[in-house]
Amino acid sequence: MKTVKELSVKEMQLTTGGKYYGNGVSCNKNGCTVDWSKAIGIIGNNAAANLTTGGAAGWNKG
């Protein structure tokens, strides 16, 4: 079991985070990283959706 520390309000206010883009990519002030276990599944889902819709799935409706 992992030991965790409860942060105070002041400590929480000092915490800075990054941005998660929902596709396995997350970025912070130090750069970006890819969680390939998530990205590969998302790439597969997007490819299947585009294949079955003739390329008109999701973000690519135009």
UniProtKB/Swiss-Prot annotation:
Keywords from the named record: Antibiotic, Antimicrobial, Bacteriocin, Disulfide bond, Secreted
InterPro entries (alphabetical): Bacteriocin_IIa, Bacteriocin_IIa_CS, Bacteriocin_IIa_dom_sf
Propeptide: 1-18
One cellular component term from this protein's GO annotations in UniProt: extracellular region
Superkingdom: Bacteria
GO biological process: defense response to bacterium; killing of cells of another organism
Cystines in this chain: C27-C32
Pfam families assigned: Bacteriocin_II (PF01721)
Localization (cell): Secreted
Family recorded in the similarity comment: Belongs to the bacteriocin class IIA/YGNGV family.
Function: Inhibits the growth of several Gram-positive bacteria, especially the food-borne pathogen L.monocytogenes, but has no effect on the growth of a number of yeasts and Gram-negative bacteria.
Protein name as annotated: Bacteriocin piscicolin-126
Lineage: Bacteria, Bacillati, Bacillota, Bacilli, Lactobacillales
